[in-house]
Amino acid sequence: MLFLKNIGVFFMIFLVSKSYATDCNKITNEEECHKSSECIVINYTPCCGEQKWACSKGTFDTCTYENSCYRNSSNNQVVEVSNKCFNLDGFIKITTPTEYSCSDAKIKECALLGKSCSFQKNSCSNPTSCCPGESICEGLSSGSSTSGGGSSGGTSGGSSSGGTSGGSSSGGTSGSSSSGSSSGGVSSCSTTHCPEGYHCSMVNDVATCLASTTGGTGLPGTSSSTAGVSSCLTTLCPIGHICVEDSNGVNCVPNGGGTSGGSSSTGTSGGHPDPCRDVDCPDGFHCECKDGKTAKCVPSPTTGSSSTSGGHPDPCKDVTCPDGFHCECKDGKTAKCVPSPTTGSSSTSGGNTNPCSNVNCPDGFYCECKDGKTAKCVPSGPTQPPKPPVCSLRCPPNHECRFNDQGHQCCVKVHHDRCSLRCPHGHECKVDHNGKECCVRSHRPPPPEVCSLRCPPKHECKFDDHGKKCCVKIHCDEVCDLDCGRGFECKIRHDGSKCCVRSERPHPPQHEKCNKRCPPGHECKVDQHGKECCVVAHRPPPKCSLRCPPRHECRVNHFGEECCVKVHHDKCSLRCPPGHECKVDQHGKECCVVAHRPPPKCSLRCPPKHECRINHFGEECCVKSRNDCLTCEDLNCERKGLHCAMKTVPIDKENCCEKVPVCYSTNPLLDGGHGFI
């Protein structure tokens, strides 16, 4: 039983640790990938492209050097990777890097065509080992004399006098040259036999044996339609060509427009037959062309991982299809070049056609073409949001006009509670449209300045928040008795709290009349926030004459009445140094402050080089002088045959000697005529 329990605990720990594991492939920030202890940054390079990076799971100890080639399943792009931990989604490992020479299989392939193999390096500035160049079959070998096709004089170039080049085939095999001008219907994968490890594909309408990237297929006699072989994922096209799947199988066709040899099946003349080629859709959209002439940006399917490396959400954005084909992405992640519909006039013969004329952008975007060839969908509409409509219905009390979800006007009940803020005189509490309480100036006229109700003892007449007269109890603690510092004075706010404010303040505006009724010795003021408060007048307040019990003192309250209030602080108990005295501040804290009386004089007679001081406890004592100034006795000038004099020092600072002793001679030969040594 204990064993089963331990297994269960271990299984739960395994599940928890697995749930908290880092998914390195989802990290799109290179710095975050470096910081993660479970992930490693791996660089990869496309053919003739700039280096990129990917975040993969692993460490520097486990992820060692291994040069490999991968193909992106979404756009058939081949990349070179130098780390064995590379596992980016959508990439399939295809081959190991090839040598910079013709392989034995390519030599056999060229021999079957009666040609010799020649390796041509890639012309870009940074070719990778995964696509260093291409092996091509060119010329006639020395032993091939069976060229059927009317060559004049048996020249090695295979050029016929009739103007067709390379039209001869030997033994029914695909003997057309690589120039792409074969006579239609001569070469076909159904009659082409490739060596082991190769399969047949149509390159420029010529049956060509290409290296298979999956083992076990491509036996002699298999065509491009054999199961497992007819796929762009297992086809390596020559440099400058792209793999296309159509109803006839797998074909390698030239990549890009403008190439000579109008082998396009669309019947177009000039321009770009693919309308989506120069259309830049916004993020979340991709270009589709279903009628062969109108490009339309449509929403991309929302899949979980349509872009694994933080690139463009539209897989067709980085795919260039050949003439007669256009890119489609139906599942949101796989870009595929499909034949364009054969329309009579997919592009006009004129060269000044507006690229935006056949582009439909999504809602909120419009087509823009700044370079004359690239159509781009950019956000449209005003730069500022439109003003909201005004609700104009007249609603009953406690209701307000609002727009419902359908945009219709209706009266709804206001659900907020009563406003609970306590506002100053002349203001009232309101709840705004966001439900927030605030004090606003009242629209009703202010109450009269004098409250005329006769109230009982220890009560006074006041106006409530609605302007009505009422008697309220007088509180004896409303005297502004804070001990404020110099330059400050005590004030009582409208809510009864006390505060110290700076005395030198700008006077309130003259049009704001202060309406608060203040006690004798006080006056009404409007502070910098527009609040009314009673402050001590600059004239002395009336003297308080009541005799109060111990720990109490006589005070004049806020309304001019005398009363005894309790003293809340005890006697100050701090022992302060001379010249200081103990005080209790407005917070009840004891502190030593400088006394306004002069400090006591020290009367002790002290020995030489000492002085009388009063210590921290008020006791007199003799201490050694801080500035022990030298005298002539200290120098012993007479023993040297010199005279001594006290010279004034031009420094007027505390603890500095006013004079210093100097030895001098009257003989100018000894001191250079200066008189001092």
Swiss-Prot record:
Record-linked InterPro entries: Dict_spore_N, Fol_N
Chain positions carrying an annotated carbohydrate: N72
Comp. bias intervals (Gly residues): 148-174
GO biological process: sporulation resulting in formation of a cellular spore
Main location: cytoplasm
Pfam family, one: Dicty_spore_N
UniProt keyword terms in alphabetical order: Cytoplasmic vesicle, Disulfide bond, Glycoprotein, Repeat, Signal, Sporulation
Region (Disordered): 148-184
Localization (cell): Cytoplasmic vesicle, Secretory vesicle; Spore coat
Description of what induces expression: By cAMP.
Residues in DSCP-N domain copies: 22-142
Biased composition (Low complexity): 175-184
Post-translational modification: Disulfide bonding is important for associating SP87 with the coat. Phosphorylated on serine residues.
Domain Follistatin-like: 188-210, 231-253, 275-298, 315-338, 355-378, 418-440, 479-501, 515-535, 571-593
Signal peptide region: 1-21
CC per GO annotation: extracellular matrix; spore wall; transport vesicle
Chain's role: May contribute to the structure of the coat at the interface between the middle, cellulosic layer and the outer, electron-dense, proteinaceous layer.
The protein, known as: Spore coat protein SP87
